[in-house]
Curated annotation (Swiss-Prot):
This is IMPACT family member YDL177C. It comes from the Eukaryota. Pfam families: UPF0029. It comes from Saccharomyces cerevisiae (strain ATCC 204508 / S288c) (Baker's yeast). Belongs to the IMPACT family. SUPFAM superfamilies: Ribosomal protein S5 domain 2-like (SSF54211). GO terms for cellular component: cytoplasm.
Length: 170
């Protein structure tokens, strides 16, 4: 679900609320061009969403920014076959397009909001997926029962869902 919100973030891409033993998790993501906007974005989120302001862990987040340029490479692969008929025509040339992303000036960071290790897990997710210019935030409403390590699985699951909804992941 996408929600219109405010001045800095026009649309939040939100995951569904995941519930486990009365704890609730929800992730949101938005495009990010400048890390200096993060405090204002977080403030805007809590002001415009009263349920977030009541969460036990409002802002577990990670972000990455970079100057990204897409380069289109045309690769030619030759299929070598033993018969002369294939060598006489161009059927052995397979042209495929590969888009490579070449980031420059990468900046990144994360915050746990009291959920030790959560921000780093989110940042690792962004790094492994090679995602740039995004802010991903996970909110947790503690339900009274410790979840152990499964809380990290829930945080990652919600983050992946919102990144897919936002078009940052296929």
């Amino acid at each position: 679900m996408s929600k219109n919100v405010g001045k800095l973030v026009k649309i939040w891409n939100e995951s569904e609320v995941l519930v486990d033993r009365k704890s609730k998790f929800q992730a949101r993501c938005c495009p990010l061009q400048n890390q200096k906007d993060i405090p204002s974005i977080l403030q805007e989120l809590t002001q415009n969403n009263k349920s977030v302001s009541k969460a036990s862990h409002m802002h577990m987040y990670a972000w990455r920014t970079a100057e990204v340029s897409n380069n289109l490479h045309l690769q030619q692969e030759q299929k070598k076959k033993g018969n002369k008929a294939n060598k006489s025509n161009n059927s052995h040339v397979n042209k495929s397009r590969n888009i490579t992303v070449q980031p420059k000036n990468i900046e990144q960071g994360c915050a746990d909001c009291g959920e030790a290790g959560a921000g780093q897990r989110l940042l690792t997710l962004l790094e492994r997926a090679n995602i740039f210019n995004v802010l991903v935030i996970v909110t947790r409403w503690y339900g009274g029962t410790p979840l152990g390590s499964s809380r990290f699985r829930h945080i990652s699951t919600c983050a992946v869902e919102t990144l897919k909804k936002g078009g940052f992941l296929p």
